Amino acid sequence: MRHGAVSYLGPDGRPASPDEVGLTEVGRRQAEAARDLFAAVDLDRVLASNLPRTLETARIVAPDAEIEEWPAFRELRGDRLAGIPEDELEDEFVHAFRGVVPNEKRFLGGETIGELFDRVLPALDRLVADRSWDTTLAVLHGGDNRALLTYALTGERMFLGHLEQAPGCVNVLDVGDDWIVRAVGIAPLDLLHGSTRLTTMEAIWQDLEPYRDRMT
């Protein structure tokens, strides 16, 4: 699943460090709804990236579980926004995940999609190779989830950006000799995704755009 909603704006209106943000009140409600969804599921393992927003989500969804931190599943790392030309900022946000995203594409001027695959696929292989578990909950990020879902569907290092991952959404996959993708993007608080027509990156840009003069 993806972590619950966060705000990437600090109290002063400047972009907050994406490595430090925690869940908003809405994000906590999304995590609580996911907890109810998983109430009847026996989870053998619960893992998250090492960032606060996934760890906080995991602790709400599975309060009795020991949370494993897997740094390889951290979110795509962008560059400093001040390093992106002002006339390219909007496009970098709203078109970050559009169509089949090339491996050489940089996320907000930082890490490439190929570099994302370089770290998440070995971690995935390590998880799958461990036969001691039957059901694992992985609380990750939108970029990770798109990469893993696309890999499960195609078996290739392909990144389908249009696999939207709303905050707090759940994906259901079976893995054995092959991958089976059973469900994608289940949002317990908004099953039909009627609360917004914006993608996650469009929503982030909408929040940041009024403060673009503070990004430099």
Language model regions located:
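Generic beta-sheet signal
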Residues: D134-L140
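Short glycine/proline- and acidic residue-enriched helix-loop micro-motifs
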Residues: V94-E115, W205-M215
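GST superfamily/GST-like fold recognition
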Residues: G142-R146, I180
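Acidic, low-complexity terminal tails and accessory targeting/binding regions
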Residues: L76-E88, A129-D134, T150-T216
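An N-terminal RHG(E/S)-centered segment typical of histidine phosphatases
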Residues: M1-L43, E56-I60, I84, D178-T216
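Amphipathic, non-transmembrane alpha-helical scaffold segments
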Residues: T24, R28, I113-L121
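Phosphate-coordination/substrate-recognition cap region in phosphate-metabolizing enzymes
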Residues: E32-R98
